[in-house]
């Protein structure tokens, strides 16, 4: 067998199947586009669902890809096994109703055994098949010539995820020899068993049945092929190394970890776990961020945060106690650059994100340890066992490996309730598995739409009306020849001016009519074969297939949509100009009455930045720039500087919307002919939608004017109420009112202090001596939570060597504050005092050794909490 680099294996695979008439499908971003069922692209076939379910027809029925993927259902196994990964590449060849078992098996055998390709020794290959799949058996045995002893029948060789396509599969195994798997059970020592000797290198799925709702199976009219070969595993076989982590995909990362940690890989099993965790997770994190994901507290962002924190925790076992993961990004970029240049192109941005996350986690790590210490105290006082749910929360929220929790617990003479912990883990796995199965289920779209292939030409770029013919009617999921008034129907036209929802732009609305009927069009979408599919309600008459009709778009809405779409392009360019090139579109909505634009950026925009962006857009509007739209090949478009939206896929011919020099962008939407038609642009809000993603909402034209007019009316009302005549006087008057308010509040605060002081009497007389300390513990009557802190400041100035603890009832809520002279904080800590008191009033709190505060919801227990804290100090 040839010894090949991973990049060479990838290229050979693609080249082989191109020779066999396959179309290369580029690797899609890890963040799914137009697929809300997936958290991540998790397999090679995930990006091809649109072809398998009929939403789109591929240029060729034969497809090959090398798809990057993320799976996080087994995170806890990564690092402890030879081949578990969260990020991996899946090589795959696919047939959409073209070739089937014969060719799929022959292709696989040729690629693996031919000296031109992988050059594997045929006598080291074994296969598994489903017991009832005699067709696959005969191909392997009679056509390929594989001995019967190397064809293993396994009941589990059937790909089935519930309703939808399913079928038997055949897996190909490579025998690595007797040196491998010596510690594995003898009963598992066969291809398909749990062992290290026989490695599965390729899985061929023969999708030939439909799994029906009643659990029966019927043959599919079009049979498909779906195969998968893990690049990392094939590299380990080709390079003859024990695990995936010793291939050229990982070893440069391992070498860098060795330099930083001063530890060696493959010397100590416990240390090796940390090496593998770090190397795996940095690949996942770097690629996910390069594809638009960012750390967050939910969704895919939470997965990234959890992976990064897990890697940081394991790095500490190697003695690395400072941010360093970000330094590995350049190495990942260098390894993967030949096929994935995106990581290198965005390396600076990726490193900034990772470094920021690392710094934050090192800060919060102390909090996690503090929580664990509290759990230990709680366990010592009760069962001598840390609650499993608490341990799981520590693991899941703070990224603490359970091994670390157990280790610290053992040092404290405790156990961890692993039964409950494992139960929580299993529930999480079950949720992940269910989500994965749901996401993989391919819903076959209506065969009616899939079988309609007649052309429907969009003419709406040039006109909002058209004389055309109604060619197809779909009612209640069936194609019909006529529909009566009052019904909702889907239909197609030979030519249509109606834009179908796409690229963030909403669909046109309007009417389709003739003398006999009228349809009010409410939605337009793309059918599986690319036609515009209209939805509408029949207003009157009887609609018939073949009717000649007039199609008219609502032109007022169309004009407003055009303005908003062109303004969105200007906004995108302005954001890049003001904030930086890291800004990428993360979503958009272009409607008639407004526009919404989501983009990647670290934090909230300042008012000055918003003003700059708004002015830039308006300046381009007022320049009256002609909007030139051309169709050209993708290479020419990029050469002229056209901006392609991140994550979008484009065909060979693209449409360029040119507002040069400010904005040149690839876009299929409808636009104004000159920027002056937009009239006016006004940002009405800027907000966050998630970690690292901001959202701008804006108005144009008449809507922007009406918005400003409304603001002016409110401003005039305010002037009237303030009794000022000119606009300039408003700010002066407002400042005057604010100053007066501050003065009154200060007077009120002073009066509150005086009242409290009168009620308290001589506080020196209330100081007690407890356990050798001067202590003032009392309830105070104050009007608000701020006043208790002010009262504390007064008491501290008078009692500088005294421990002071105050509590108050403000609006049926407890406020507490404690101070300890700094000379005493080695023995008594204010934070501890509040933490002891707070639970008694059903609250919580904490703070520094010299000052702490807290609150609670049971003011009836204030006296009890004050008595308790006196006893607590007495027993220190």
UniProtKB/Swiss-Prot annotation:
InterPro entries: aa-tRNA-synth_II/BPL/LPL, Ala-tRNA-lgiase_IIc, Ala-tRNA-ligase_IIc_anticod-bd, Ala-tRNA-synth_IIc_core, Ala-tRNA-synth_IIc_N, Ala-tRNA_ligase, Ala_tRNA_ligase_euk/bac, DHHA1_dom. SMART domains: tRNA_SAD. It comes from the Bacteria. It is found in: Cytoplasm. It comes from Staphylococcus aureus (strain bovine RF122 / ET3-1). Keywords: Aminoacyl-tRNA synthetase, ATP-binding, Cytoplasm, Ligase, Metal-binding, Nucleotide-binding, Protein biosynthesis, RNA-binding, tRNA-binding, Zinc. Catalyzes the attachment of alanine to tRNA(Ala) in a two-step reaction: alanine is first activated by ATP to form Ala-AMP and then transferred to the acceptor end of tRNA(Ala). Also edits incorrectly charged Ser-tRNA(Ala) and Gly-tRNA(Ala) via its editing domain. The keyword Nucleotidyltransferase does not apply. Its main location: cytoplasm. This is Alanine--tRNA ligase. Its EC number is 6.1.1.7. One of its GO terms (biological process) is alanyl-tRNA aminoacylation. It catalyses: tRNA(Ala) + L-alanine + ATP = L-alanyl-tRNA(Ala) + AMP + diphosphate. The lineage of its organism: Bacteria, Bacillati, Bacillota, Bacilli, Bacillales.
């Amino acid at each position: 067998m040839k010894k090949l680099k991973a990049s060479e294996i990838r290229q050979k695979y693609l080249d082989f199947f191109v020779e066999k008439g396959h179309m290369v499908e580029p690797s899609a971003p890890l963040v799914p586009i137009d697929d809300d069922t997936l958290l991540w692209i998790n397999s090679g076939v995930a990006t091809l669902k649109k072809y398998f379910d009929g939403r789109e027809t591929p240029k060729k029925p034969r497809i090959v890809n090398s798809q990057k993927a993320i799976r996080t259902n087994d995170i806890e196994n990564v690092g402890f096994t030879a081949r578990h990964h969260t990020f991996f590449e899946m090589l795959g060849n696919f047939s959409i109703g073209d070739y089937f078992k014969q060719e799929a098996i022959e292709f696989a055998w040729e690629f693996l055994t031919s000296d031109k390709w992988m050059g594997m020794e045929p006598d080291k290959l074994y296969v598994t098949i489903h017991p009832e799949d005699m067709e696959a058996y005969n191909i392997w045995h009679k056509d390929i010539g594989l001995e019967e002893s190397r064809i293993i029948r396994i009941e589990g060789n059937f790909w089935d995820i519930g309703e939808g396509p399913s079928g038997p599969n055949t897996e190909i195994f490579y025998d690595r020899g007797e040196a491998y798997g010596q510690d594995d059970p003898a009963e598992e020592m066969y291809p398909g068993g749990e062992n290290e000797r026989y490695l599965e290198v390729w899985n061929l799925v023969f999708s030939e049945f439909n799994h029906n709702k009643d659990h029966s199976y019927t043959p599919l009219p079009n049979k498909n092929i779906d195969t998968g070969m893990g690049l990392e595993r094939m590299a380990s076989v080709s390079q003859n190394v024990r695990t995936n982590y010793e291939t050229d995909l990982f070893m440069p990362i391992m070498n860098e970890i060795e330099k930083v940690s001063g530890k060696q890989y493959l010397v100590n099993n416990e240390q090796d776990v940390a090496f593998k965790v770090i190397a795996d997770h940095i690949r996942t994190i770097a690629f996910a961020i390069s594809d638009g994901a960012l750390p967050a507290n939910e969704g895919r962002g939470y997965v990234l945060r959890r992976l990064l924190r897990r890697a940081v925790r394991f790095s500490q076992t190697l003695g690395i106690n400072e941010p360093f993961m970000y330094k590995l990004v350049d190495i990942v970029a260098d390894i993967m650059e030949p096929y994935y240049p995106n990581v290198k192109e965005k390396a600076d941005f990726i490193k900034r994100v990772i470094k920021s996350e690392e710094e934050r986690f090192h800060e919060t790590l102390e909090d996690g340890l503090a929580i664990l210490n509290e759990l230990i105290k709680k366990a010592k006082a009760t069962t001598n066992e840390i609650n499993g749910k608490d341990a799981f929360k520590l693991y899941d929220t703070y990224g603490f490996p359970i091994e670390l929790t157990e280790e610290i617990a053992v040092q404290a003479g405790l156990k961890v309730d692993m039964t409950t912990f494992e139960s929580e883990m299993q529930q999480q796995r079950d949720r992940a598995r269910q989500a994965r199965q749901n996401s993989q289920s391919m819903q076959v779209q209506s065969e009616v739409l899939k079988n309609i292939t007649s052309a429907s030409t969009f003419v709406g770029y040039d006109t909002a009306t058209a004389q055309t013919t109604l060619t197809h009617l779909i009612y209640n999921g069936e194609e019909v020849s006529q529909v009566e008034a009052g019904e909702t129907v889907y239909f197609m036209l030979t030519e249509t001016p109606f834009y179908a929802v796409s690229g963030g732009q909403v669909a046109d609305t309007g009417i389709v009519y003739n003398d006999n009927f009228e349809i009010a069009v409410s939605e337009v979408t793309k059918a599986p074969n690319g036609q515009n599919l209209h939805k509408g309600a029949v207003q009157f008459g009887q609609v018939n297939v073949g009717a000649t009709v007039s199609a008219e778009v609502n032109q007022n809405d169309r004009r407003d949509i055009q303005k908003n779409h062109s303004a969105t392009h200007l906004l995108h360019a302005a954001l890049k100009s003001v904030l930086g090139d890291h800004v990428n579109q993360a979503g958009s909505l272009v409607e008639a009455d407004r526009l919404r634009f989501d983009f990647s950026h670290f934090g909230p925009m300042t008012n000055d930045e918003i003003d700059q962006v708004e002015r830039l857009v308006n300046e381009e509007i007022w320049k009256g720039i002609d909007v030139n739209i051309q169709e050209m090949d993708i290479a020419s478009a990029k050469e002229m500087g056209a901006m392609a939206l991140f994550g979008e896929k484009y065909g060979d011919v693209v449409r360029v919307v040119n507002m040069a020099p400010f904005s040149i962008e690839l876009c299929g939407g409808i636009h104004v002919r000159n920027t002056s038609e937009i009239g006016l642009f006004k940002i009405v809000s800027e907000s966050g939608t998630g970690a690292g993603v901001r959202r701008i909402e804006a108005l144009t034209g008449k809507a922007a004017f009406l918005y400003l007019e409304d603001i002016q009316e409110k401003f005039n009302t305010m002037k009237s109420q303030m009794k000022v005549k000119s606009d300039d006087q408003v700010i002066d008057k407002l400042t005057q009112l604010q100053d007066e308010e501050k003065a009154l509040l200060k007077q009120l605060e002073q009066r509150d202090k005086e009242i409290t002081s009168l009620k308290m009497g001589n506080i020196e007389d209330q100081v007690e001596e407890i356990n050798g300390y001067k202590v003032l513990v009392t309830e105070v009557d104050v009007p608000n939570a701020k006043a208790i802190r002010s009262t504390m400041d007064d008491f501290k100035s008078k009692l500088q060597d005294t421990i002071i603890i105050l509590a108050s009832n403000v609006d049926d809520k407890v406020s507490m504050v404690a101070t300890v002279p700094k000379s005493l904080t080695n023995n008594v800590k204010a934070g501890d005092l509040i933490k002891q008191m707070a639970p008694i009033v059903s609250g919580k709190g904490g703070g520094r050794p010299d000052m702490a505060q807290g609150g609670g919801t049971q003011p009836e227990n204030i006296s009890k909490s004050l008595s308790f804290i006196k006893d607590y100090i007495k027993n220190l």
